[in-house]
Amino acid sequence: MAEKRVVITGMGVVGPVGNNSYDFWDGIRHEKNGIGQITHFDTAGHKACMGAEVKDFVFPDKRAAKRLDLSSQYAIVAVREAMADSGLKAGENVDPYRFGVIGGTGIGGIMTLEAETKKAIERGVSRVSPLMVTMTIPNMIAGNISIETGAKGIS
């Protein structure tokens, strides 16, 4: 069987230890702990109140952020960094039809789903965002990355 290689061309990170590759690796090297009190939702009534949340994150495009769940925002920022690090640009130095995106999530979009469900209960279903479905389906992270990068290959 022929030996196959995996080549890392660029890196991007958004995580509890750093929101870019440099800060992430610096945090790992200095044994920074990304675990702390959960702040993204009320933990009252839950057994767990600690987690590894992303901190100090601001999506650079406020208008686009309204259409994207936080999970997609994290992914897009990490992909932008990885693409810049690699020097790859779909349509310029990479054939977009040979450039695909594979990604996944266990429950990406859950924060939007929870917020919109609460809105429906408290204010009525007419107040639910028409973008809720596109913000909560799990494959939208890969879809949003494809849109961001121009990837049109197998995904």
Language model: regions and residue ranges:
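Conserved "HGTGT" condensation-loop signature of ketosynthase/thiolase-family condensing enzymes
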Residues: 1-154
